[in-house]
Design a protein with these regions (language model features):
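ATP/NTP-dependent adenylation/nucleotidyl-transfer catalytic domains that generate, transfer
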Residues: 164, 169-170, 206-272
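Core alpha/beta nucleotide-donor-binding catalytic domains of modification enzymes
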Residues: 1-31, 35-214
């Protein structure tokens, strides 16, 4: 386990290594009230002066989970008041959106969140959206993609940094991607900080939930205690390989100058 006083240092090291922030960035934080996003908020607040960050936290109410969701909203608002961080709340009807667009509620919720983050970022001239995915999320994503038959891109998992649009003016960063869930919760407990628990994460209704609650613990307990770390590390290797192959393919296509009248022409002899 990471010593309490080294926890923030480890995250800062990851931020600097991956170049997630620039000095003076305005950062939008996705704040659900769960352990991961609460940790992210508190860590970035403590690093605020080092990077000269402006911080805005956004909580999206999905229109599900009844009183539990209202509790999470109130908790998130009060936490931001305590930490003197700008707070924005957004209410939406995720079940209706899911039905309208033939999506799962999980997919619809994700769409609403990122659309909200992007909208609020543009209003404020913010260039960075920080979300709280961690190493266990990375391992779950890789396993889920493998089970769905994904190739090298799916095995790359969750990127630590990506552009939200083709323009590249807003990026999504994940400062906690190098941390285990248990380390995050341990740090919060030692800090005396409470968090909200989404009871839907405790069910096995979704594939990701079953991987989180059953498969990954089985791999860790019966095969290798560091299973999550090794899977996340492999995701990084796959990501580098995928980037290399993409760059090589792009260079090859460019050298062939093979686009003619909006059609792609490939030199078959060179491919043999």
């Amino acid at each position: 386990m990471i010593p309490h006083d080294k926890f923030i240092d480890k995250i800062k090291q990851y931020i600097d290594e991956k170049k997630l922030f620039s000095f003076g960035d305005h950062v939008i934080i996705g704040l659900s009230g769960g352990a991961d996003s609460v940790c992210l908020l508190l860590v970035l607040k403590r690093l605020q002066q080092i990077y000269n960050l402006s911080i805005t936290a956004i909580h999206v109410h999905h229109g599900i989970r009844g009183e539990s969701a209202e509790h999470d909203l109130k908790f998130s608002r009060q936490l931001c008041e305590k930490e003197e961080i700008e707070f924005v709340e957004k209410r939406c009807d995720v079940p209706a959106l899911a039905a309208k667009h033939h999506l799962t509620e999980e997919e619809a919720g994700r769409r609403v969140r990122y659309e909200t983050f992007e909208c609020e970022a543009k209003k404020r001239g913010a260039s960075v959206i920080a979300v709280a995915h961690h190493m266990d999320d990375q391992a779950e994503t890789v396993l889920m993609n493998l089970l769905r038959g994904s190739g090298i891109r799916g095995c790359s998992g969750i990127p630590c940094k990506r552009s939200l649009s083709d323009k590249g003016d807003i990026v999504v960063v994940r400062p906690l991607l190098g941390m285990r869930r248990e380390a995050i919760e341990a740090w919060l407990i030692e800090s005396g900080q409470e968090w909200c628990i989404d009871e839907t994460n405790l069910t096995d209704d979704y594939l990701r939930s079953r991987i989180r609650n059953r498969l990954l613990p089985l791999l860790s307990s019966e095969y290798n205690a560091q299973a999550a770390e090794h899977i996340a590390c492999a995701a990084g290797d796959f990501s580098e390989a995928e980037e290399y192959l993409r760059d090589q393919a792009q260079a090859l296509f460019s050298s062939w100058n093979c686009v003619l009248h909006k059609q792609m022409m490939l030199p078959v002899k060179e491919l043999k």
